[in-house]
Design a protein with these regions (language model features):
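Short recognition patches in nucleic-acid-associated and regulatory proteins
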Residues: 1-8, 22, 26-63, 86-88
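Short, well-ordered loop/turn elements at secondary-structure boundaries
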Residues: 14-15, 23
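Short cysteine-rich clusters marking metal-coordination/redox-active sites
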Residues: 21-25, 74-77
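Flanking scaffold residues of small Cys/His-coordinated metal-binding clusters
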Residues: 15-16, 66-69
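Short, intrinsically disordered terminal segments enriched in charged and Pro/Gly residues
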Residues: 1-12, 88-123
Length: 123
């Protein structure tokens, strides 16, 4: 199986075009779709992470009316795969979109190769 490490905790299984958790190998959906939709999603009040630094009207802590910390966890092992700071109600972002067809073409043509689960140039 051809596997590519995309992020610290996210792999691309190229043969079956699936996202996989790097820790527990949980299937996170089609690599042609947003892996985040298969994740456990938790929204946190930013004040839980960024404690107010001073007792005043402006505390240097993010305002929860303006921002939420959105965490994406693997549903298999609960490893945190991604974190985003988004306005409340903002849709889930689609931050990784790989052109799988072009990637396969370049691998087949020998322009790229997979070494130790990393994508590398042959030139």
């Amino acid at each position: 199986m051809a596997r590519i490490r995309v992020t610290e905790y996210l792999d691309l299984e190229l043969d079956d075009e699936r996202w996989r958790c790097r820790v527990c190998d949980h299937d996170l959906g089609s690599a042609r779709e947003n892996y985040k939709h298969a994740c456990q999603i938790n929204q946190r009040d930013p004040r839980e992470i960024h404690q107010p630094l001073i007792e005043a009207e402006y505390t240097f802590a993010p305002d929860p009316d303006w921002v939420r910390i959105v965490e994406f966890h693997c549903p298999g092992c609960f490893t945190q795969i991604e974190t985003e700071y988004l306005p409340p109600g903002h849709p889930v972002t689609h931050d990784i979109e790989i052109d799988l067809d072009r990637l396969r073409e370049r691998l087949d043509a020998g322009e790229l190769e997979i070494r130790d689960e990393r994508l590398g140039s042959t030139r």
